Amino acid sequence: MSNSRLMTIDRFNKLTGHETLHPLICMVDLSRTNLNEDIRMMCDFYGLLYYNDPEQDKISGKEWLRLIYPGETVEIPLNRHRHTGCCSGVLFHPDLLCDTSLENRIETYPKRCCCKGTLSEHERNIITDNLREIGEELHHAIDRYSASIIASHIELLLNYCIRFCNQ
């Protein structure tokens, strides 16, 4: 098991073999990695992970959303990132939120929001569409609007996830 000290965005990208497009945020798609061991990380960032294994979902409803807060230790077992699109999400450093509306609201989100169950196709599409929008903004040249736009997308995604977890 990869057991790091404090996991940063850059360290996470290096561990998973992804390029760091922005020092304060990264997209997670563990289906595109060459990991050969479990990941155990103490985070210095916020995050939202979405896990969906289409094969297992039919059998046991293994699908979840999880909010991550700085200081949490997160484990991602190897078998969770062996299927296409099974573990995706976004990780973002608190500094990304500076001078955005989300900076003041982030602490209002539940510290332990994790929903397990089957999401509807519509709910899955909302999650993947929001993640795609964040990823597209990361590929745009960084300018003075970048953090605000990304934070807005993250806030929308978090609000939807809270809704889905409370249904």
Walk through the language-model features, giving the residues of each:
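A short, N-terminal "cap"/entry segment at the start of jelly-roll beta-barrel domains
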Residues: 1-21
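Surface-exposed loop/turn and secondary-structure junction residues enriched for glycine/proline
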Residues: 12-15, 99-100, 122
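Generic surface-pattern signal
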Residues: 14-17, 102, 132, 136-139
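N-terminal regulatory/effector-sensing and dimerization cores
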Residues: 21-112, 143, 147
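Short, intrinsically disordered, charge-balanced linker/junction segments flanking boundaries
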Residues: 49, 165-167
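Amphipathic alpha-helical segments enriched in hydrophobic/aromatic residues interleaved with Lys/Arg
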Residues: 109-156, 160, 164
